[in-house]
Amino acid sequence: MAKEPTRVRRRERKNIVSGVAHVNASFNNTMITITDAQGNTISWSSAGAMGFKGSRKSTPYAAQVAAEDAGRKAAEHGMRTLEVEVSGPGSGRESALRALQAAGFTVTSIRDVTSIPHNGCRPRKRRRV
């Protein structure tokens, strides 16, 4: 019995001019998601998805490569201007932002949306090296 050939789904080209780049820079990884104004994901990338493993994922260079990849995918959909929302304490915050600007996007605003607890959960124990 022959299997049906699996059909490859091609991504249709959306024509979106402006969007929001969400940069989530944690201590272990940096994730970049580019959405339209309503919050629908247009493109995404992360340091881990770009082939970095372990402690190399948390480097600024890995964040730069991930931002360039997400920006290239978003530019295929016609995106030109971005608002950037940065969250998290990681080292890839500034380098991801610079990579998006170097990719040819016009950055209209930069917002830090890192959540700060009003004495919520107990923090993890101190590292002793």
Curated annotation (Swiss-Prot):
Protein name: Small ribosomal subunit protein uS11
UniProt entry keywords in alphabetical sequence: Ribonucleoprotein, Ribosomal protein, RNA-binding, rRNA-binding
Alphabetized GO MF terms: rRNA binding; structural constituent of ribosome
Gene name linked to the record: rpsK
Keyword match rRNA-binding: yes
GO cellular component labels: ribonucleoprotein complex; ribosome
Family matches, as InterPro entries: Ribosomal_uS11, Ribosomal_uS11_bac-type, Ribosomal_uS11_CS, Ribosomal_uS11_sf
Functional note: Located on the platform of the 30S subunit, it bridges several disparate RNA helices of the 16S rRNA. Forms part of the Shine-Dalgarno cleft in the 70S ribosome.
Biological processes, Gene Ontology terms: translation
